[in-house]
């Protein structure tokens, strides 16, 4: 009997292990396939961008030829003798071409005309590394000469030492030396080659620097926003450094993340970044933020870099990089006829913040001479007491009294948890979508590790369909219709409410959590996930 029981137990362990391995393998294969599809998609978009760029180049060359013909005709003063040796057909063609007044399309040379004076102004003057491509994440680290202390080696060690062997094959770290003094650049390269010989030799690390001809004259810039002449020059050059680095990095991977040369990274930062991006693969985001400070930890999709660089180059003399990034979002989604709150909601769908922060600023001495910079990211060491999801744009409201700034708006955006004082019957939490949305699933989780008892009880989940004349409903669904037009589709059990939305109720105008009875405890809502239908 013991032998038989032991055999059964062994068989169960074997089957459980086999099923677990099968599930994990399928899950891992699914992730890898998604990354492969993303690579193919981004490669296709990149080829399209290159084709468009070449078309613009050919168009510019044609305009140059036509301008040459126009000058020839003007110099000939319309004399027939000047073109008498051409056939009638050729003369007619020249006349037709020179009479065309096509509009010129602005490009990088319009904003930086000095680049036309030298060949190779957009090619690195120094380039060290294997030129690795086809990775998931490209990390860009700009560095310049600091008078007091350089943090570059410590930054690179922090990033590299926290990568697994597999992760080291799926990324590339680009160090951009923003100096034109070749002697200094070569000294930095020599130090990096000595310290990181293995990483450079494997293709993990690359080092580049721009040619002196890439930079315009930075000595006669207009002073704006109360900044000194030196600070205006510093921030203007910084914008140009970012642009060169991003243009170089764009074709190397699926995502590009901007870092600085004076940071430290959290353990498992790479897998966290990659998995978070994969979760949002179906969302229309533009910036993922993995730090709240400046330009640190801002990640972009490779195809979006073209727009970002073009926008920065249009205004590189006017404002710092973080302001310009916010302006891009404003231009894309903000309606001048709406208020600032509506604008912030729209921008939050393009600019998604991950918490806690994955990178911490450690540099005390800024690259701007004489500036002491005591900036630290307060979210870096915080435990995560809420979960982050991207929800449909909505106006949120509640009858509950909020505690210590833990607002519903922040929770909906994935920035914090919602904390409110004791609910009573009739209290509600309302999510009114900016436009009707087809919803597949929902999840609301209350309580958190610090306050596990602060849960929602006796609370229902209601939805308001956009269509008022719904007839394609089962009788049990119709019975859940409330007098105000909402439909009751779920309730909280053990602090959790989750489920699907009947497809016949879609599209949905609003979600509501309704408190049915007085509660004896405060409530925390730490996770909100209203998942769109993927086909929406």
UniProtKB/Swiss-Prot annotation:
GO cellular component: endoplasmic reticulum; endoplasmic reticulum-Golgi intermediate compartment; extracellular region; Golgi membrane; Golgi stack; peroxisome
Glycosylation sites: 77, 458
Reaction(s) catalysed by this chain's protein: N(4)-{beta-D-GlcNAc-(1->2)-alpha-D-Man-(1->3)-[beta-D-GlcNAc-(1->2)-alpha-D-Man-(1->6)]-beta-D-Man-(1->4)-beta-D-GlcNAc-(1->4)-beta-D-GlcNAc}-L-asparaginyl-[protein] + UDP-N-acetyl-alpha-D-glucosamine = N(4)-{beta-D-GlcNAc-(1->2)-[beta-D-GlcNAc-(1->4)]-alpha-D-Man-(1->3)-[beta-D-GlcNAc-(1->2)-alpha-D-Man-(1->6)]-beta-D-Man-(1->4)-beta-D-GlcNAc-(1->4)-beta-D-GlcNAc}-L-asparaginyl-[protein] + UDP + H(+); an N(4)-{beta-D-GlcNAc-(1->2)-alpha-D-Man-(1->3)-[alpha-D-Man-(1->6)]-beta-D-Man-(1->4)-beta-D-GlcNAc-(1->4)-beta-D-GlcNAc}-L-asparaginyl-[protein] + UDP-N-acetyl-alpha-D-glucosamine = an N(4)-{beta-D-GlcNAc-(1->2)-[beta-D-GlcNAc-(1->4)]-alpha-D-Man-(1->3)-[alpha-D-Man-(1->6)]-beta-D-Man-(1->4)-beta-D-GlcNAc-(1->4)-beta-D-GlcNAc}-L-asparaginyl-[protein] + UDP + H(+); an N(4)-{beta-D-GlcNAc-(1->2)-alpha-D-Man-(1->3)-[beta-D-GlcNAc-(1->2)-[beta-D-GlcNAc-(1->6)]-alpha-D-Man-(1->6)]-beta-D-Man-(1->4)-beta-D-GlcNAc-(1->4)-beta-D-GlcNAc}-L-asparaginyl-[protein] + UDP-N-acetyl-alpha-D-glucosamine = an N(4)-{beta-D-GlcNAc-(1->2)-[beta-D-GlcNAc-(1->4)]-alpha-D-Man-(1->3)-[beta-D-GlcNAc-(1->2)-[beta-D-GlcNAc-(1->6)]-alpha-D-Man-(1->6)]-beta-D-Man-(1->4)-beta-D-GlcNAc-(1->4)-beta-D-GlcNAc}-L-asparaginyl-[protein] + UDP + H(+); an N(4)-{beta-D-GlcNAc-(1->2)-alpha-D-Man-(1->3)-[beta-D-GlcNAc-(1->2)-alpha-D-Man-(1->6)]-beta-D-Man-(1->4)-beta-D-GlcNAc-(1->4)-[alpha-L-Fuc-(1->6)]-beta-D-GlcNAc}-L-asparaginyl-[protein] + UDP-N-acetyl-alpha-D-glucosamine = N(4)-{beta-D-GlcNAc-(1->2)-[beta-D-GlcNAc-(1->4)]-alpha-D-Man-(1->3)-[beta-D-GlcNAc-(1->2)-alpha-D-Man-(1->6)]-beta-D-Man-(1->4)-beta-D-GlcNAc-(1->4)-[alpha-L-Fuc-(1->6)]-beta-D-GlcNAc}-asparaginyl-[protein] + UDP + H(+)
GO molecular function: acetylglucosaminyltransferase activity; alanine-glyoxylate transaminase activity; alpha-1,3-mannosylglycoprotein 4-beta-N-acetylglucosaminyltransferase activity; metal ion binding; protein homodimerization activity
Residue ranges the record marks as coiled coil: 28-54
Residue spans, topological domain Cytoplasmic: 1-6
UniProt membrane topology term: Single-pass type II membrane protein
GO biological process terms, semicolon-separated: glyoxylate metabolic process; N-glycan processing; protein N-linked glycosylation
Transmembrane segments: 7-27
Means of activity regulation: Inhibited by UDP.
One of the Pfam families matching this protein, by short name: MGAT4A_C
Source taxon at top rank: Eukaryota
Keywords of this entry: Coiled coil, Glycoprotein, Glycosyltransferase, Golgi apparatus, Membrane, Metal-binding, Secreted, Signal-anchor, Transferase, Transmembrane, Transmembrane helix
Residue intervals on the Lumenal side: 28-536
Enzyme Commission number, as recorded: 2.4.1.145
Subcellular localization: Golgi apparatus membrane
Biological or metabolic pathway of the protein: Protein modification; protein glycosylation
Cofactor: a divalent metal cation
Modifications the protein undergoes after translation, according to the UniProt entry: N-glycosylated.
Record-stated family: Belongs to the glycosyltransferase 54 family.
UniProt-recorded name of the protein: Alpha-1,3-mannosyl-glycoprotein 4-beta-N-acetylglucosaminyltransferase A
Source organism of the structure: Xenopus laevis (African clawed frog)
Gene behind the chain: mgat4a
């Amino acid at each position: 009997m013991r032998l038989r029981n032991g055999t059964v137990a062994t068989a169960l362990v074997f089957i459980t292990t086999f099923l677990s391995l099968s599930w994990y393998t399928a899950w891992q294969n699914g992730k890898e396939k998604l990354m492969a599809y993303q690579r193919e998609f981004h490669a296709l978009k990149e080829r399209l961008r290159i084709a468009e760029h070449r078309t613009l180049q050919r168009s510019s060359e044609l305009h140059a030829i036509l301008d040459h013909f126009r000058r020839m005709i003007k110099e000939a003063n319309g004399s027939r003798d000047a073109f008498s040796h051409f056939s009638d057909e050729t003369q007619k063609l020249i006349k037709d071409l020179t009479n065309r007044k096509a509009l010129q399309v602005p490009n990088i040379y319009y904003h930086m005309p000095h680049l036309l004076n030298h060949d190779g102004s957009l090619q690195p003057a120094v380039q060290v590394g294997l030129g690795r491509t086809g990775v998931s994440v490209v990390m860009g680290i700009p560095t310049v000469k600091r008078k007091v202390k350089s943090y570059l080696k410590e930054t690179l060690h922090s990033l590299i030492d926290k990568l697994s062997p597999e992760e080291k094959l799926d990324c590339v770290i680009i160090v951009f030396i923003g100096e034109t003094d070749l002697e200094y650049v070569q000294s930095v390269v020599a130090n990096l080659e000595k310290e990181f010989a293995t990483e450079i030799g494997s293709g993990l690390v690359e080092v580049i620097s721009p040619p002196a001809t890439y930079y315009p004259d930075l000595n006669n810039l207009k002073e704006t926003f109360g900044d000194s002449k030196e600070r205006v020059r510093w921030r203007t050059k910084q914008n140009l450094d970012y642009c060169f680095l991003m243009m170089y990095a764009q074709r190397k991977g699926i995502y590009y993340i901007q870092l600085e040369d004076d940071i430290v990274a959290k353990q498992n930062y790479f897998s966290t970044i990659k998995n978070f991006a994969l979760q949002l693969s179906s969302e229309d985001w533009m910036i993922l933020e993995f730090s709240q400070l400046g330009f640190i930890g801002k990640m972009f999709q490779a195809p979006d870099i073209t727009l970002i660089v073009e926008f920065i180059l249009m205004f590189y003399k006017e404002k710092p990089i973080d302001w310009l990034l916010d302006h891009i979002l404003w231009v894309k989604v903000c309606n001048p006829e709406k208020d600032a709150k509506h604008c912030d909601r729209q921008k939050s769908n393009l600019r998604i913040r991950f918490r806690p922060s994955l990178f911490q600023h450690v540099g005390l001495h800024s690259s701007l001479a004489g500036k002491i910079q005591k900036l630290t990211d307060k979210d870096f060491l915080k435990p995560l007491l809420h979960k982050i999801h991207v929800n449909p744009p909505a106006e949120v409201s509640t009858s509950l009294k909020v505690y210590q700034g833990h607002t519903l708006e922040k929770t909906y955006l994935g920035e914090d948890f919602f904390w409110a004082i004791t609910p009573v019957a009739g209290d509600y939490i309302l999510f009114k979508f900016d436009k009707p949305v087809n919803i597949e699933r929902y999840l609301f989780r209350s309580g958190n590790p610090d306050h596990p008892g602060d849960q929602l009880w006796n609370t229902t989940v209601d939805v308001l369909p956009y269509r008022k004349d719904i007839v394609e409903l089962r009788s049990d669904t119709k019975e859940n219709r409330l007098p105000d037009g909402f439909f009751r589709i779920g309730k909280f059990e053990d602090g959790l409410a989750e489920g699907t939305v009947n497809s016949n109720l879609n599209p949905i105008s609003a979600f509501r959590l309704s408190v049915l009875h007085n509660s004896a405890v405060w409530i925390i809502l730490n996770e909100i996930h209203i998942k769109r239908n993927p086909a929406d």
